[in-house]
């Protein structure tokens, strides 16, 4: 059989089109030929061995791939024409469409519920196949075509020619060419809803096709790109809540996957379509409350054991143990907040008892064996790491007496049930099997209810995590990831994570990231990329720093001395790169304790300046010196010493000591204050060029090396957290890859306005009022009275003084305005939803805060004060939400 490939694509001299075909579990590549650089073709002689072939085109120059088509929806050739001797394909180059979100599993699996079907075989002597994409169709609608002539239905709505959705959102139909009355076809596509007896015609002029002369056994395939219908864009509403914050009568002091199912039911009952969660990965480092930080995972694959639904497990057979467990569960569930340590001790102990009772039976089953086979790449090292962490009493594998790095040679023993090594780790296999099963069940439940589960991809991993232990080549351990100063933290954020070695990751096509995304797609149909700016550049902080002010972007383009001089600033290297400590600085900072600071912590450098003593010349040394201090005055002194150390105008490049970077937010420090006014003007110009213009093309290129691979790794809907210090290149990339942005009215991306205009939100965005890193709406309302007053008058268009605290009716108005925004998704925190009902909401607004980013030691323990059962029974509240969503057009 011969398959003739044809595609029109204008190339540059030296470029070539290549077709990449999936054949017999491998990818084969063939170069196309052209006479004019635009019309390309290739004839493939093949003995068909499969029912369908998928393929895509790419542009290659001298063996280097310059560009590929959109890979999420590849071309598909169904080999269903029984009498076919040859196929002639007329293809379109597939770019990422503006409505690419409609191809995500969020829409195809959760909202529309239309699974692809196999094309029926046809027995025509000559066949014309028509293919078109129709992503706009709603649940229950099918695509058909009508046109001139009997084969095309004679334009009669009673004779619509049905098409088959052979892949998601792509429809195909085979026509008997021998019955066509003319080689000139005129047709249109129609969307048919049989339940409503409605037919919708596509927009635009009639489509025409002029068929070539066809021989017997020939199949001509026309890709007609996309059918467009006059349908409004879908807008959806949802709730964001951490799993750990859920409360039910059955839970054990923390939300679990059983509670997640109940929350899905609640969300669905009000017409909401999205439920957004925080990361659910295992974070167990110390077995203390400091492990409560959900973004500091020890494995990007493993699930945290505390989310196990105990009621979904077999009952404990020992009556005494069962009664004791129930008593402890009730005690933990009565707490207003999560007691992380008690909850995890209880659940791990309970899982151990279930393992002793049911382990052999469950682990001998087919489901468990299939799970091991599917996950062993990460599961086996994770189990060994967890065992060694507990055995050695620390997760810092550099301190272990042996096994300081994962040894692949140990995998064999760790997967052999007869070995001692296996018996050491089998509990961890068992627990992850249970968690995987429960989370997948919750995911399937959400899809059945028409709810999109949206997960969260943390930007980093703990520096002593299993991922670093297993594959250290992917991580830079000589720095710390964080974020520059922003509305969340004036000193920047230091997350402590190692930064990524992207050069190493790109060598294998970002396989670690691809595995991570594929694993996540088992549980979610949408995800939030935490700190998407990190894929452009990450804020890298020296390991001896506590705050983020001494960081620099990586990668970045440092400045030479000559460049700095070129701006008109006399570069005094010693003065600008050493902490600027003088008598007047000390008096301003420490007041009556200035002399104490000079005596204890400083040495005289010259007639004007001081320097830090060697034992306190880094922030980490200061931190260690004050480690056991709890007195507020001493903490104030410690923070002052931190500030002295970061009081520099430039930081030296970490890789090349001959290059320099302006220190972030230097304008707020004493060294900037000491400059002449003319030098301040010059420095400001240099600073703005460096942070907002110098790197745009460079960072665009860095992001485009990584993000296209990652966003096309799965069909999950891609959303990004793009807040903070956002360079101009970020929206370029997000628009090119069709990634949803995050829009907060109180943190507008337009620097010229104080509050964003909701009607100007891009459609491809997620609108919210507050995030887990912010005060809730009620807290924000009372945080800054003058700001609230301005918002009340200018954004809510209300006269007079703003009421305090925030009344429920006004919270409802704010929510209604957000639901009416132009954003595709409006996802609000459960605390902000509850703000509309003064009888139900938490009496203390401060008790609703989930995280304080400025505090790296924050205890993540917020839990809903109401049970899910109580919420479900609050009919007036539930009806209120349903009404708000309907009025916002999000149904």
Task: Indicate residue ranges for each PLM-predicted region.
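A short, Gly/Thr-enriched small/hydrophobic beta-strand-prone motif that recurs across taxa
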Residues: 1-8, 123-134
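Aromatic-rich carbohydrate-binding modules that target alpha-glucans
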Residues: 2, 8-50, 60-81, 136-184, ...
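Residues in well-ordered beta-strands of folded domains
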Residues: 6, 20, 58, 78, ...
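Residue-level recognition of alpha-helical structural elements
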Residues: 66-67, 77, 86-94, 100, ...
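Short, surface-exposed secondary-structure junctions/capping segments
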Residues: 82-98, 215-228
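Catalytic cores of glycan-processing enzymes that make or break glycosidic bonds
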Residues: 103-129, 176-179, 208-891
């Amino acid at each position: 059989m011969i398959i003739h490939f044809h595609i029109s694509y204008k190339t540059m001299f030296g470029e070539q089109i290549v077709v990449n075909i999936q054949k017999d579990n491998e990818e084969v590549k063939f170069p196309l030929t052209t006479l004019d650089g635009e019309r390309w073709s290739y004839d493939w002689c093949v003995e068909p061995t499969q029912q369908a072939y998928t393929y895509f085109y790419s542009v290659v120059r001298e063996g280097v791939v310059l560009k590929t088509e959109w890979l999420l929806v590849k071309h598909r050739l169904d080999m269903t024409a029984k009498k076919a001797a040859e196929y002639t394909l007329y293809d379109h180059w597939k770019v990422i469409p503006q409505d690419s979100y409609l191809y995500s599993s969020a829409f195809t699996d959760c909202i529309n519920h239309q699974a692809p079907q196999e094309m029926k075989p046809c027995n025509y002597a000559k066949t014309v196949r028509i293919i078109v994409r129709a992503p706009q169709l709603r649940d229950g609608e099918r695509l058909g075509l009508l046109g001139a002539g009997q084969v095309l239905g004679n334009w009669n709505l009673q004779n619509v020619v049905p098409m088959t959705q052979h892949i998601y959102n792509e429809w195909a139909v085979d026509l008997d060419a021998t019955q066509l009355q003319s080689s000139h076809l005129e047709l249109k596509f129609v969307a048919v809803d049989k339940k409503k007896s409605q037919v919708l015609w596509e927009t635009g002029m009639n489509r025409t096709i002029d068929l070539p002369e066809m021989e017997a056994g020939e199949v001509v395939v026309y890709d007609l790109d996309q059918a467009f219908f006059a349908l409004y864009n879908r807008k959806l509403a949802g709730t964001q809540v951490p799993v750990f914050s859920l409360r039910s009568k059955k839970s054990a002091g923390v939300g679990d996957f059983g509670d997640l199912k109940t929350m899905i039911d609640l969300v669905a009952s009000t017409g909401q379509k999205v439920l957004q969660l925080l990361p659910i990965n295992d974070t167990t480092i110390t077995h203390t409350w400091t492990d409560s930080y959900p973004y500091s995972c020890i494995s990007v694959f493993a699930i945290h054991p505390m989310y196990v639904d105990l009621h979904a497990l077999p009952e404990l057979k020992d009556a005494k143990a069962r009664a004791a467990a129930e008593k402890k569960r009730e005690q933990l569930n009565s707490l207003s907040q999560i007691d992380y340590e008690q909850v995890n001790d209880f659940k791990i102990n309970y899982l151990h008892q279930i393992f002793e009772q049911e382990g052999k039976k469950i682990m001998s089953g087919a489901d468990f064996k299939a799970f091991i086979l599917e996950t062993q790449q990460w599961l086996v090292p994770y189990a060994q790491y967890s065992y060694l962490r507990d055995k050695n009493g620390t997760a810092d594998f550099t301190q272990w007496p042996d096994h300081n790095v994962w040894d692949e040679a140990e995998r064999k023993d760790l997967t052999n049930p007869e070995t001692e090594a296996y018996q050491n780790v089998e509990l961890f296999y068992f627990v992850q099997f249970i968690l995987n099963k429960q989370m997948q069940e919750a995911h399937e439940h959400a899809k059945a209810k028409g709810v999109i589960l949206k997960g969260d991809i943390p930007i980093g991993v703990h520096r002593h995590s299993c991922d670093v232990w297993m594959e250290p080549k992917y991580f830079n351990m000589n720095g710390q990831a964080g974020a520059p100063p922003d509305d969340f933290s004036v000193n920047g954020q230091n997350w402590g994570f190692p930064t990524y070695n992207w050069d190493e990751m790109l060598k294998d096509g970002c396989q670690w990231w691809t595995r991570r995304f594929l694993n996540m797609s088992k549980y979610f149909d949408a995800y939030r990329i935490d700190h998407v700016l990190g894929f452009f550049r990450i804020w890298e902080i020296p390991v001896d720093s506590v705050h983020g002010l001494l960081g620099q972007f990586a990668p970045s383009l440092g400045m030479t001395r000559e460049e700095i001089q070129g701006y008109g600033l006399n570069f005094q290297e010693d003065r600008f790169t050493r902490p600027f400590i003088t008598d007047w600085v000390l008096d301003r900072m420490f007041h009556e304790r200035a002399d104490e600071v000079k005596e204890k912590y400083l040495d005289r450098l010259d007639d004007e300046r001081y320097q830090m003593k060697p034992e306190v010349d880094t922030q980490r040394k200061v931190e260690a010196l004050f480690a056991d201090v709890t007195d507020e005055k001493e903490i104030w002194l410690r923070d002052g010493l931190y500030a002295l150390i970061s009081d520099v105008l430039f930081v030296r490049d970490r890789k090349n000591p001959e290059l320099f970077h302006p220190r972030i937010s230097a304008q707020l420090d004493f060294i900037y204050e000491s400059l002449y006014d003319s030098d301040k003007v010059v420095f400001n110009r240099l600073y703005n060029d460096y942070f907002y213009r110098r790197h745009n093309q460079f960072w665009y290129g860095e992001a485009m090396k990584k993000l296209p691979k990652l966003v096309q790794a799965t069909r999950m809907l891609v959303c990004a957290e793009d807040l903070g210090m956002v360079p101009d290149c970020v929206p370029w990339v997000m628009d090119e890859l069709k990634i949803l942005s995050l829009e907060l009215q109180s943190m507008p991306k337009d620097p010229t306005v104080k509050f964003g205009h909701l009607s100007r939100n891009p459609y491809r965005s997620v609108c919210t009022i507050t995030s887990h890193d912010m005060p809730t709406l009620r807290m924000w309302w009372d945080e800054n009275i003058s700001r609230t007053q301005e918002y009340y008058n200018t954004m809510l268009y209300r006269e007079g003084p703003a009421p305090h605290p925030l009344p429920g009716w006004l919270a409802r108005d704010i929510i209604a305005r957000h639901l009416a925004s132009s954003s595709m998704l409006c996802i609000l925190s459960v605390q902000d939803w509850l703000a509309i009902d003064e009888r139900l909401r938490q009496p203390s607004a401060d008790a609703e805060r989930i995280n304080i980013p400025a505090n790296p030691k924050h205890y993540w323990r917020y839990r809903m004060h109401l049970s899910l059962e109580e919420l479900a029974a609050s009919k007036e509240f539930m009806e209120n939400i349903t009404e708000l969503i309907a009025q916002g057009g999000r149904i």
